[in-house]
Amino acid sequence: MKPNRKPKYLSPSALACWERDPDEYYLRYICPVRKPRDPQTDPMAVGSAFDALVKNRINVELHGYEATKATEYALCQLVADQCEGHTLPDALEIACILFEQYIECGAYRNLMDVVHLSTRDVRMEFTVTETIGGVPLLGKPDLHFNTPKNCEVICDWKVSGSVSTAGVSPQQGYARALDVHGSRTHGKAHKKFDPVDHVSGLVVNGWKMNESTDYWADQLATYAWALGHWVGCEDWVARIEQIAVRPGYRAKCVVHQSTVDCDYQHRLLDRYQECWNAVESNHIWKSLSKEESVARGDMLYTRLMMPDDLSSLSAGGDFEVNWNGL
């Protein structure tokens, strides 16, 4: 059997995968033969297309249309990079409907009013790596800028419910909701938004992000560490631009702006260290003994190498397995 692969880094999505489904984690990151990538789903494609639209718009506003055409933020380039062909043009059409509402309701301008105050260059879609507590971490922030008080804001867009027949409601604790339909929540904060003056000069929610949506907190805290903040630091701002979609592609655009609790960050690092220890010790399934864990990995690898169609195992069928690859 070929030796296992070893990932160079852990990311928030990798940690979540290992905690949720060790089998899937093994097949994605450890198995000697990489599992074929799953096709991009419709919700993922709509989110990626929206992401392309907003980042193109921001770059055009900051640097001009002609300058943007020559960069990776050209719209055609972003869409090609982020959306798989089988999802187009449908995903882009839905994303355009949502993006128009994001602009019209004022959510985009609400964000850019803060971005334009940045004391440093605004960065989007960039890779950061850092070893924290012995764990090599990797992140890819959607948007990063500074406040006039030189505090960093780490921002991510989330499109929720774009292809759901029932739609979704925004996560609790948002600072402001905006839409083009004149709903009763338009222009208002969620009841769990507890305004607190932050060292950044911005108003944040005293109800920490890890208390409302822990995966968002995991993601943005990881980015903050990789950008140089110490574990437990709350001097940076975690911002989520959420587009919650109801039936008929009616979007409610809300902004979540808060911090991630110091103790929660330390527990997050503990989780990363546990995952990295599992990788380095080749003991992926912590609920099993080391021997049972290795055996489960061998079984998954063997199953991956088997042909999809096992009908040839019936009498008279030709069946070949590349045993040298096992």
Predicted regions and their residues:
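A non-catalytic, helix-rich entry segment at domain boundaries
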Residues: 49-126
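Short amphipathic alpha-helical segments and their helix-coil junctions
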Residues: 2-7, 23-36, 77, 154, ...
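Nuclease catalytic cores
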Residues: 8, 12-63, 96, 124-125
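Metal-dependent nuclease catalytic regions and adjoining charged, substrate-binding loops involved
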Residues: 10, 178-217, 222-326
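Non-catalytic protein-protein interaction segments used by genome-maintenance enzymes to assemble
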Residues: 126-219
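Hydrophobic/aromatic-lined pockets within catalytic cores
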Residues: 31, 54, 58-62, 145, ...
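Short catalytic/ligand-binding loop motif for oxyanion handling, primarily in non-cytosolic enzymes
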Residues: 26-27, 35, 161-166, 246-250
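Short, solvent-exposed loop/turn segments that connect beta-strands within catalytic domains
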Residues: 64-65, 132-134, 147-151, 231-234, ...
